[in-house]
């Protein structure tokens, strides 16, 4: 079961936060919300669709941080919760000067943007 204000899907709990933070602060905020909490990670297109169903009505057409980043500058993107990057939403990773991945609230299109940008975000933890 998920706490009040959190939504349940496939054994995880999710919550949209209508405040903007940079990637690092948002990830830290998520870890402080619940044990095992992180910025959202996607393991399937169904999970991504579920998150879109949460974010789109609240945030309309904007971006949310995901837990995906290359903050260690290792030329390898990783989820902040340590899960496998098996689902990529057909995303072609072009390595740029930016390191953090945000997701479009309307359609889950990913974009690599500067980690210092202020964006809304979704936290997730295992129920």
UniProtKB/Swiss-Prot annotation:
Q: What PROSITE patterns does the entry give?
A: C_TYPE_LECTIN_2 (PS50041)
Similarity annotation: Belongs to the snaclec family.
User: What does the record give as the function of this protein?
Assistant: Thrombin and prothrombin (F2) inhibitor. The IC(50) of thrombin-induced platelet aggregation and fibrinocoagulation is 62 and 35 nM, respectively. Its inhibitory activity is at least 10-fold lower than that observed for other thrombin inhibitors.
Q: Which SMART domains match?
A: CLECT
Q: Where, by tissue, is this protein expressed?
A: Expressed by the venom gland.
> What are the residue boundaries of the C-type lectin domain, all occurrences included?
9-124
Name listed for the protein in its UniProt record: Snaclec bothroinsularin subunit beta
Q: List the disulfide bonds.
A: 2-13, 30-123, 100-115
- Keyword Disulfide bond on entry: yes
Q: Which organism is it from?
A: Bothrops insularis
Which PANTHER family does the entry mention? Answer: MANNOSE, PHOSPHOLIPASE, LECTIN RECEPTOR RELATED
| InterPro entries, sorted | C-type_lectin-like, C-type_lectin-like/link_sf, C-type_lectin/snaclec_domain, CTDL_fold
Top-level taxon in the UniProt lineage: Eukaryota
